[in-house]
A protein has these predicted regions:
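N-terminal secretory signal peptides
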Residues: 1-34
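Primarily recognizes the serine-hydrolase "nucleophile elbow" in alpha/beta-hydrolase
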Residues: 169-229
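N-terminal export signals
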Residues: 23, 32-58
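Short beta-strand/loop motif that positions the catalytic acidic residue
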Residues: 234-236
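Short beta-strand element of the alpha/beta-hydrolase
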Residues: 102-111
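Cap/lid segment of the alpha/beta-hydrolase catalytic domain
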Residues: 113, 139-162, 272-277
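Gly/Ser-rich "nucleophile elbow"/oxyanion-hole loop immediately N-terminal to the catalytic nucleophile
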Residues: 149-188, 302
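N-terminal cap/lid segment of alpha/beta-hydrolase-fold proteins
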Residues: 64-99
């Protein structure tokens, strides 16, 4: 039995300007006070600014498509060496419980709030599809995900960004080198994690079998893009002007470099449309993007 989503609010329940304002808050471009100030004009008809703020917060129960204790999976917390990063990086490792032989690996990279329950569930979804999924927590060396999104965003900003990037590089290499891995790994990331997937494609070159980036920042230097050898699948939201607006130039650069890349822009969707814990979730776009992701990994990582 899946989560009860009967009371889920949809993006269409909110003015787009309010969703854009919340996007700025989530990404640290404005603080809570700034959000409240900008949201005042929407607090009408009995609505309060505090009520609007609360309605936009994630409900992690909605994201539990695969229970934490699902008997079909083996899960554990592991710590990986990261000598070029923060020394170590902790994470969540998921494997099929009845796996026989080596497994293809998928690195799952979180948004800008660390390893929250939504990303853990994504790892479990991949585990049920026959992958060994590893979801590192970029905030693990400063205490790890604190269980509160606002605190998580603040904690995330305390970690040196260059070292955190190296932590994900180390995690990918660790996953690829595991004796129970086939040596073929892919990576999927969301928001901040989408940007990391693009960076992984540059860093690992042919050692990455496939990369899938959901609304992730793109590299711009031609010498970096020339290093990309992995096939890329890139998902963008039409209403995410900043990130999606840079996709055409990235597409042109990838083609010039001879890279294999496919991008989709999902009409009417907001940044974060795959995250099924918030009102920005777009069910149709999320399901289509996820099926495309699964098919892509099955072709390039499992195949």
């Amino acid at each position: 039995m899946g989560p009860d989503t009967s009371k889920r609010r949809k993006a269409s329940d909110f003015p787009q300007e309010l969703l854009d304002l919340f996007h700025l808050y989530v990404h640290g471009e404005i603080d809570r006070r700034g959000f409240f100030s900008g949201a005042r004009k929407f607090a009408v008809g009995g609505l309060t600014v505090a009520g609007l703020f609360e309605a936009l917060q994630p409900n992690f129960a909605w994201a539990e498509q695969v229970p934490k204790d699902d008997a079909r999976l083996k899960t554990e917390r592991v710590t990986v060496p990261s000598p070029q990063g923060n020394g170590t990086v902790g994470g969540y490792l998921v494997r099929p419980a009845n796996a026989a032989g080596k497994l293809p690996g998928i690195l799952v990279v979180h948004e800008n709030r660390g390893l929250n329950p939504y990303i853990e569930d994504v790892a479990r979804r991949l585990g049920l599809l026959g992958y060994m999924a590893f979801a590192p927590d970029g905030t693990s060396t400063v205490g790890g995900y604190p269980g509160d999104e606002e605190k998580a965003t603040a904690l995330f900003r305390t970690v040196d960004s260059a070292k955190m990037t190296q932590d994900f590089f180390a995690a990918a290499r660790w996953l690829k080198a595991r004796p129970d891995c086939t040596g073929k790994i892919g990576a999927v990331g969301f928001c901040y994690g989408g940007g990391i997937v693009n960076k992984l494609a540059v860093e690992l070159g042919p050692d990455l079998a496939a990369g899938v980036a959901f609304y992730g920042a793109q590299p711009t230097a031609p010498e970096d893009i020339a290093k990309i050898k992995a096939p890329l699948l890139l998902h963008y939201a039409a209403l995410d002007a900043g990130i999606t607006g840079r996709w055409p130039a990235y597409e042109t650069a990838l083609k010039a470099a001879g890279a294999t890349a496919t991008g989709y822009v999902y009409e009417g969707a907001n940044h974060g449309f795959h995250n099924d814990t918030t009102p920005r979730y777009d069910e149709a776009a999320a399901k289509l993007a996820w099926q495309r992701t699964v098919d892509f990994f099955n072709k390039y990582v499992k195949g």
